[in-house]
Amino acid sequence: MMTLVIVFGIGGCSLPPNENHDRSNSLQTKTKWMNDPQADLNIENGLTAFLALDDAFLSIASRIHLIRNAKHQLDLQYYIWNDDAIGNLMLHELLNAADRGVKVRLLIDDQNGIKLDKALKALAQHPNFEIRIFNPYKFRHLRFIDYIFRLKQINHRMHNKLTLADHSIAVTGGRNISSEYFDAGDQFQFSDMDILFYGKAVERAEEVFDEFWNHPLSYSTEQLLGQGTAQQLENLRISYKTLDQVNTPTEDKLEAAQDYLKLRLENYPIQWAKAHFVADHPDKARGQAQQQQLLYSQVLNIMGKPEQHMELVSAYFVPTERGTAYLNQLSKDGIKVRVLTNSLVANDVAVVHSFYSQYRKPLLQNGVQLYEFKPNIERKKRTWYEIATGSVIPVKGKNRSSLHAKFFDVDGKVFIGSFNFDPRSAHLNTEVGLVVESDHLQDQITAMLDQHLLQVAYQLKLDEHGNIVWCEHKDNGEVIQHHHDPESTRFQRFTMNVVSYFPIEWMM
């Protein structure tokens, strides 16, 4: 009986035709966003201003700053947009922008699930608010059927993260829209990196958004969810206003972060450099992109082969045999190669660790420096918020944490974006990022890693027998050596070893 139901469902349920859906492009009206008297000249000379955002609250504040100050248009593109405090805060801010006449376009990958469907359906009723869903599942409430019969199609996801305002200023990086990416989760936090940029590189970012927005894999909410009603939109307004009336520590920190960010943009010198927005073509989600349309090809062309050093931070690191050979050869050629990724217990996608772990020993044997992010981080320094407000945030033990950042630098060129060093980012998902040609930014990143790496990560080495040891550096100078993945159980290690034999590395 179940077989008949599934077969009948497959025959009777299909996505609506979408090849000729309404096309729209970004408005070309630009807004001035900073008080730099040289800004216009720098942009004419092909330069881009940038501000790296390693602090979670400054990162969410930058997005809210763009939304609240946009005058003409907002374009947002995300892989995950959760139905939580941060997700609803951002939707409310976008609704407020639409109310004051700003054109809002929101594109979300359908891997996000159905929890936001009700809100998205209501928001799409607003005349200034357009919402599309990328590469949707046919069976929205029985998604396992898609995994069985449409794996080739739904295995490609839009992993992009991008916020654009007035065709002038943007934020990209590794963070999705969810509380755990912005230090607002109750039990779990991601450590991540974004970058705010203004100037020449934004032009390409807007072109990329339009390519995805107008692609046949982007479906309107009306096509997938049906038409919403004015009453549904009004009910959503009421729920957002109710949430607004509850003042939380998160709201206080966000207000302080926005003030701090505004001060930085208006009164502090902002770095300018040549920068390149890079992205996969949306046809990659169909497996049809040409080589030159792939992000990693664009990055290699811009950054070139390392001559002095390469620092790589990747939440999900599966170098494959080819990538391992490449990194090993760099190290043999005398180039300093330093890699930071998640430890087994820190990794929120544990199966990825199964296919990374087999490459650790060959990398170490050839001189590649390897570090693994600890699953529990104790905060050692005062945050910008404590310094700016004179307050002290109490620390209650350790926070469960995971590395989610994706950035690397090669000889004065820095990439910050959504791309992980793994087969999924290279061949399956679409990705975006910004390459900045800046010795200053590279020096900042190198100094940050030098200062904090031994605090937040285990240093991997080989002992006299050629076995891997995990070195945990304590504040008092003591070094504790672990002889298996720290804080893991025997069952976890056994399971990861078994999974590593499955022929699915190409999906990682």
Model-inferred region functions:
Residues 2-9:
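Bacterial N-terminal signal peptides
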